[in-house]
Each structure stands twice: as C-alpha cells, then as structure tokens.
C-alpha cells in the first residue's frame, strides 16, 4: 500500500470537525439471562433496553452514551493547534455518580487513536507492527482474497495474519485502491485476546480514508469496539469517530490567543437536538435514544442507592486497573 497520508501540516491553515460517540454497554446478554434473571423479570424496562449488536453478534444493554463535537484548527506560522469543543452530550448511568467522568476519561485512554501509517502502533500499552509498515512485510502473511468496491472505489481485498501464530499481532483485512496510487481505502483490524491484557477479550478497529474535493487523502472514519471482562462483568465499549468539513481557509487570529490546546465553548453543554441532528455522523440506536428514560426508571427503583454503590465500586476498581 502507498504509505503516505497527505500531511495536512504542510498547509498554512486547516480546520475540520470531529464527531465522536462513546457507548458503554453490558455485553453478552443471553436468551437464558433474559428468561431467568431476576433483574429482567422484576424490571421489564431492563429488557426493553437490550438490543442486538451486529459487529459482535451479541445482545447488549447500553448504559451510557457520550457525544462530543470538536473543531480542530491549525496554523503553520507560528505553529499552533487548538481543539475547540463545540458540543458535549452525555446521558446514562455515569450521570448518577461522580466517577462517571473518570470512567469516560479512562475509556478514552484505552481507545487511543491508532495510526496505521506509523510503523509501530501502541495500543493497550503494547507496541504492534502496522500491517502497512516496512516491518509488517516480515511480520505478517498476506493473502489476496478478492477485488471489490468500497463506496465507489474499486479495491484489492487483502487478508493478513502474523507469520508466526505464536506472535501477538493484528489480524484483519486491508482494502487497497486498484489503481496506480495503491492508497489504503479501508482497514479492519482485530486484536486477539492476550492473557496479560486481563480485561480485554476482543478489540475491533475499523478505519476508512477518502479524497477531499481538493485532492488530499485523509482519514474519514475511525471506529473501535472493545469487549471487556472484569470482576465477572461483561462489558462492551464502542467509539465511533467521523472527520468532516475540512477547510484550508485562514482561522481568525483570536482563536490562537486562547490559553491551552483544548478549549471548551461556553455553550458546549447546552446544544439542542437541532445541533446534534446536524453534526451527528452516527445515528443513535433505539436504546441510546431512550437513555434518559432508562436512567429515570433506574433511579426510581426501591433500594437503588445500594445498586448505585455497587456500580460505583465496580467502576472505581476498573479505573484503578
């Protein structure tokens, strides 16, 4: 594959929007648990919150959903980059206790950005060879599977696995443009379970790339899904990221005079439905949309404060690991 993403930092100015959705859910809700669990029998609204996740072929029960819209702005001379948080929308069980923000921070740390264009990728505190790196040629074995279309682009479909089955590396599929550029159009990466990454059972990474009207080749989609198991609880976390609205026009000077790299807009927490309908790149599922009602019913349960105490302890233990 062509190993070059167009380096936007060669431009004098650029800005673009990053929409991100982070969902935390109970995982692996089986037919037996739906039928036999006292929780689902006693509180039908829990059953109503369960939905199917096609990516892992399991039923899940979403507990919280966090959305952010961030504008990334860059100036070459003098060099400066700012992340302006335009919108924040958070609903779910993390609203009910102080640890919620801490959990979101930890999950975002677990879900670090993976840049496959770098030779070495660091994920879950481990280094991995990228499947399109110079080292990858020796580490992975590649198989040409098919010629297919991604969006409207004709691509070669390549599967890859570590050369040595004992080695800890990605498995997955690359989609390379079937033209003279050989650019990476899409990649699907799977991270197999490793015993000493004690809480991660499975991780799936999906990235997509495309050309801007002005010709630059940029990342448009960066999605990650992780199945976790800690203290006997099965959880799924999904992060959906979409980059859009690229512009190379000059950003007003006043933006770069603000202190700190991350700047929160004064109205970020007060955005209305119209705002989110405009910028939401990944639609909310039925259960995610119903999160507010789910939390209200949860808070009405008799003895809920004891359940909350247990949830808080579980999350604090996870944060410490």
Spans of features found by a protein language model:
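Structured extracytoplasmic
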Residues: 1-157, 161-169, 227-320
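Short, hydrophobic/aromatic-rich segments at coil-to-beta transitions
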Residues: 13, 151-159, 183-188, 216-221
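Short conserved beta-strand segments at catalytic cores or DNA/RNA-binding microdomains
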Residues: 159-162, 173-182
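Short helix-loop boundary/capping segments
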Residues: 166, 179-180, 188-191
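Extended lipid/amphipathic-ligand handling interfaces
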Residues: 173-178, 204-213
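Transmembrane beta-strand segments that form the barrel wall of outer-membrane beta-barrel proteins
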Residues: 187-193, 319-321
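Outer-membrane beta-barrel proteins
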Residues: 192-202, 206-209
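Cysteine/selenocysteine-centered motifs that mediate thiol-based redox chemistry or coordinate metal-sulfur cofactors
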Residues: 208-231
């Amino acid at each position: 594959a062509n190993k070059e993403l167009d380096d936007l930092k060669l431009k004098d100015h650029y800005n673009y929007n990053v929409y991100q959705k982070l969902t935390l859910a109970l995982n692996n809700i089986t037919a037996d648990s739906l039928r036999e669990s006292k929780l689902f029998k006693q509180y039908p609204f829990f059953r109503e919150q369960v939905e199917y996740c096609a990516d892992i072929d399991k039923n899940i029960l979403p507990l919280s959903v966090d959305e952010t819209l961030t504008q990334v702005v860059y100036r070459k001379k003098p060099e400066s980059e700012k992340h302006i948080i335009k919108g924040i929308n958070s609903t779910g069980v993390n609203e009910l206790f102080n640890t919620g923000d801490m959990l979101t921070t930890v999950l975002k740390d677990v879900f670090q950005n993976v840049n496959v264009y770098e030779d070495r990728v660091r994920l879950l505190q481990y280094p991995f060879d990228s499947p399109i790196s110079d080292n990858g040629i020796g580490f992975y074995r590649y198989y040409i599977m098919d010629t297919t279309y991604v969006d409207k682009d004709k691509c070669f479909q390549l599967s890859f696995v570590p050369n040595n089955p004992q080695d800890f590396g990605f498995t997955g599929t690359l989609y390379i443009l079937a033209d003279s550029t050989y650019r990476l159009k899409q990649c699907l990466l799977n991270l197999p379970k490793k015993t000493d990454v004690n809480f991660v059972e499975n991780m799936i990474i999906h990235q997509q790339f495309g050309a801007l009207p002005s010709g630059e080749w940029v990342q448009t989609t960066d999605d990650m899904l992780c199945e976790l198991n800690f203290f006997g609880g099965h959880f799924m976390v999904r992060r959906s990221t979409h980059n859009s609205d690229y512009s190379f026009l000059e950003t007003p000077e006043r933006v770069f005079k603000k202190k700190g790299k991350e700047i929160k807009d004064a109205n970020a927490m007060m955005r209305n439905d119209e705002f989110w309908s405009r910028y939401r790149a990944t639609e909310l599922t039925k259960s995610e949309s119903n999160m507010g009602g789910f939390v209200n019913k949860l808070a009405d349960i008799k003895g809920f404060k004891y359940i909350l105490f247990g949830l808080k302890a579980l999350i604090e233990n996870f944060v410490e690991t």
